[in-house]
Amino acid sequence: SLGLVGSEMCIRDSLVTGPTGSGKSTTLASMIDHINETRNEHILTIEDPVEFVHKSKKSVVHQRELGQDTRSFANALKSALREDPDIILVGEMRDLDTISLAITAAETGHLVMGTLHTSSASQTIDRIIDVFPQGQQQQIRIMLSNSLCAVFSQTLLPKLSENGEKKGRVMAQEIMVVNGAIANLIREGKTSQMYSAIQTGAQHGMQTLETALALSLIHIS
């Protein structure tokens, strides 16, 4: 299930990041399911592979799988923009073409959600910017600051019983909401200052991974 911040971020352009096996696909599937149950939208997902099958509820959902329905994320995104979806889920932003098309889609009014293999919000911004040639990077910073609304960087922790046995896993998330201060840091290339902004941004729904880990330990115990 989604918490309040997660539900709010469903109506915005967001990225979910973390290492392999950190639950990124599950988080995005929860967001898609929330939208599907509550809003009348056209949702298009591009995945490798399709891990969660979504039946149309209030929304109409179309799912595309790499290798079966399309050759690449970039090709699928190009086709997607011709199908007039309201929401596009990009399973993984792997290369310049995919990232560029995703930013363009967000700038043209589509809600775009996607994943990257990064471990923090600041690393996510750096990874996106660094994909582009030096001469394009400032323009991409501006575009990203205008279109990005949130980054969720997550990890999964083992949940232990009182006798030390594993009882599943619990998720901890760093949450960066792109308010005016964060947007300025993106535009100015000051990603090193993002952690401090996240620390002081609790009133906007932000939290550091350390705070999330502390809350997870309380929840586990």
Enumerate the predicted regions with their spans:
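Short, flexible helix-loop junctions that flank or precede catalytic/ligand sites
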Residues: 1, 7-8, 12-217, 221
